[in-house]
Amino acid sequence: VHFATGRMHADEAKPTYYLFIGEDETAGSEADAMLLLADNDKKKEMTFISIPPNTKVVRQEKTNLLLKDTFKEGGAEETKSAVENLLHIRIDKYAVVNYADFRENVSKAGPISLYVEKYMEHLDRDGSFDIGLNQGYQPLDSEQALGYVRYVDKEDGEIGRIQRQERFLKILLSHLQSRMALRNWLTVRYGFCAVESDITPSEAASLAYRLTGYP
């Protein structure tokens, strides 16, 4: 399993591209996070690419728009098209995951332990803490995991948040790779949650199964 940034290059063994969109319903249903998975079954490798939601895209009307706002404007299809034009690829499948879906998927994968690098807190619109994490190594439940990948501070801003999202994903994937392939298949086949997707449960389960055997 690999992580990459930048544009994908053409190759004889073309991968299958999956776009995962994280929806922030509290911000008017904008795309809060984007992850592209390039699955190359022939090469037995998967590459994950984080796409900053604040990336500017130019449309045919010659107007600039932030990538995250394409979802609010035209839904998943609009965002999918924008990413295709940005990276010059054809996306085969996509899934939109909201906060509830994220919590459910992480809960089924099991507690994820990691080192929280700083104290993190955030108040919601009602003045209540919706993120509250102490510094240190600790197991995160699904709600805490959501807070970790959502958190943005003044020091490192959006870049820091993307780095945390990538770090969490690496640890999650390592956790899944430590389990039996059949267990991952069953977990995803009967438990994968998405508010909108054209990835079938069987396709998602197949990805999880093969992921277990990839370096």
Across the structure, where does each feature detected by a protein language model lie?
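Non-catalytic, solvent-exposed segments at the cell envelope interface
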Residues: V1-P215
